[in-house]
């Protein structure tokens, strides 16, 4: 299984990185608020909140920001927005399928911005089900590979119920069934493995391999969608050769 479609990133100048950091914090805060609202403000009894907080800490979010987000979500502090989940399906250039997950307090704004961004990037919105049939919900745990024994990780994950472990270079990716995510994550923690994130994701069943030119177009469109405030996650079914990925990383 290729990891390119999940881990492909392009390098940005410092200003762009700083801007993305601010947007990342906003997305992480939304995740924390929603998790606390749905499952309560105690991370020990709310695995989704535990993972949302853990991911925010990994991104170096200040502890005070995290604590306030938990309180807002749990109703202990005013200021929480009334977010709703919306999922859009779309196409990028070269027939690449996109699933765009939004958390928004304004459905009309989210729809207009997603549609406009897709159109400007030579993509389009798709009817419900026309893209998602090629994806399936999975749990995904990302483990930094440095200093980690792959065989030990694989054995620990498999015994806990994981479906697969792949070597994606700087990280190992543990794939689970959606209901097994927390069990496998806990088993890895107890075995001493550090991890970057544990999330529910949409994994493509089939991937489209792109040329450098098409990969540039699709990457730019996904970046522009990710910049939208209402967009939380984007999943796609594109991949590319190692040579193409190396060229993208240099740009």
From Swiss-Prot:
GO cellular component, as recorded: cytosol
Keyword DNA-binding in annotation: yes
Coiled-coil region(s): none
Location(s) in or outside the cell: Cytoplasm
Matching InterPro entries: Integrase-like_N, TACO1_YebC-like_2nd/3rd_dom, TACO1_YebC_N, Transcrip_reg_TACO1-like, Transcrip_reg_TACO1-like_dom3, YebC-like
Example GO molecular function: DNA binding
Pfam families named in the record: TACO1_YebC_N (PF20772), Transcrip_reg (PF01709)
Keyword DNA-binding: yes
Swiss-Prot/TrEMBL keywords: Cytoplasm, DNA-binding, Transcription, Transcription regulation
One of the GO biological process terms: regulation of DNA-templated transcription
Principal subcellular localisation of the protein: cytoplasm
Assigned protein family: Belongs to the TACO1 family.
HAMAP family referenced in this protein's UniProt entry, alphabetically: Transcrip_reg_TACO1
Name of the protein: Probable transcriptional regulatory protein BL0726
Organism: Bifidobacterium longum (strain NCC 2705)
Source organism phylogeny: Bacteria, Bacillati, Actinomycetota, Actinomycetes, Bifidobacteriales
